[in-house]
Curated annotation (Swiss-Prot):
This is UPF0421 protein SAV1889. It comes from Staphylococcus aureus (strain Mu50 / ATCC 700699). Keywords: Cell membrane, Membrane, Transmembrane, Transmembrane helix. The keyword Repressor does not apply. Belongs to the UPF0421 family. It is a multi-pass membrane protein. Coiled coil: none annotated.
Length: 328
């Protein structure tokens, strides 16, 4: 806990950005170069992972060179007091970056291009080369800092978001079953809650991908990979749960489904046992209720009637099976 105190005060990424800016400025001043362009590059190069910094930095460098080149070209043609110089420099920089698939570097390329125009004067070649050099300094410094200083660890964030996802999933499943028991097949409230859970799980998967990238670029212990695999498996199960949950939320309009008393009781018991997982950490099996729903599905398959009802009960059993496997 003590080695992560900085995260509660300012954030590791913010600290790394500050260090990268400082060192970039030091290197540029030591070489008698204007540091502002290198600093712009350094700031945008700090990414969530070292891999992202390297990949995007590889594309930002040529984009910056393109921006500097157009700034010099149009300053030579129109001078640094013409609106055409600024407009054409920005336009052609964006155009070429897009055509060459260097979009990740477009922002810093345009900023560099526009910022350097007032200071070019007649030193066209010198300004072009110096801006290219400062961009390299910013990219390299920022990339190394991101790789070496405070390598990001997303385990805590992933576990926190997974726990939140679990709680919201179980609650929504319980509430949705209550709606189904009352024959409320359409529910804006459930749809809104589902979208929130879906977005939250996407955040989890993004953080997991970040952590996997970090582990591939740093030598880590086997326990780190083991923990990541456990979190990945848990997120995958949640993805399946969410998918099945969506299938009982988004139902055809103008559809009516009626459940018998035994079926309602089975839905109530299963949904209650799943909701209670968040409170006591255990999954209470409801074998009798499961068998009731299975019998109903078999009967509906034989008769070929009420496919929507069969579909709903099947999805409920699939969710039950997922959790039965997770807590086996």
């Amino acid at each position: 806990m003590n080695d992560q105190w900085y995260k509660h005060l300012i954030g590791a990424r913010t600290i790394k950005t500050g260090i990268a800016i400082f060192l970039t400025a030091v290197f540029c001043m030591a070489l008698d170069l204007t540091p502002i362009y290198a600093i712009l590059t350094a700031v945008v190069t700090i990414e969530p992972t070292a891999k992202a910094s390297l990949i995007k930095g590889y594309r930002r460098l040529p984009a910056t060179v393109i921006g500097a080149g157009f700034a010099v070209l149009f300053t030579y043609l129109f001078g640094d007091q013409s609106p055409f110089t600024y407009a054409l420099s920005a336009t052609f920089t964006i155009l070429f970056c897009t055509k060459l698939k260097l979009q990740v570097g477009t922002n810093v390329a345009v900023l560099t291009s526009l910022a350097m125009i007032p200071g070019i004067h007649d030193a066209y070649i010198f300004n072009f080369l110096s801006r290219t050099l400062t961009a390299i300094i910013g990219l390299v410094t920022s990339g190394l800092i991101n790789f070496m200083v405070f390598p990001p660890k997303y385990y805590g964030q992933v576990e926190e978001k997974l726990s939140k996802t679990d709680a919201l999933m179980y609650k929504l499943f319980y509430n949705r079953c209550q709606e189904l028991i009352l024959s409320r097949l359409q529910s804006d409230k459930s749809e809104k809650a589902y979208k929130n859970i879906f977005n939250l799980n996407n955040q989890v998967e993004t953080l997991i991908s970040y952590q996997r990238d970090e582990l591939s670029y740093h030598k880590k212990k086997e326990c780190d990979w083991k923990l990541l695999n456990q979190l990945t498996k848990r997120a995958y199960t949640n993805r399946l749960f969410i998918t099945h949950l969506s299938n009982i939320i988004y139902l055809p309009k103008n559809t009516r489904v009626n459940f018998s008393g035994d079926e309602k009781m089975a839905l109530l018991k299963i949904s209650s046992s799943i909701k209670d997982i968040f409170y006591d950490g255990t999954f209470k099996r409801e074998d009798d209720s499961v068998e009731t729903l299975r019998s109903t599905i078999k009967a509906l398959e034989i008769s070929g009637e009420n496919q929507i009802k069969s579909h709903i009960l099947y999805e409920v059993l699939m969710i039950y099976r997922l959790l039965d496997s997770r807590y086996a």
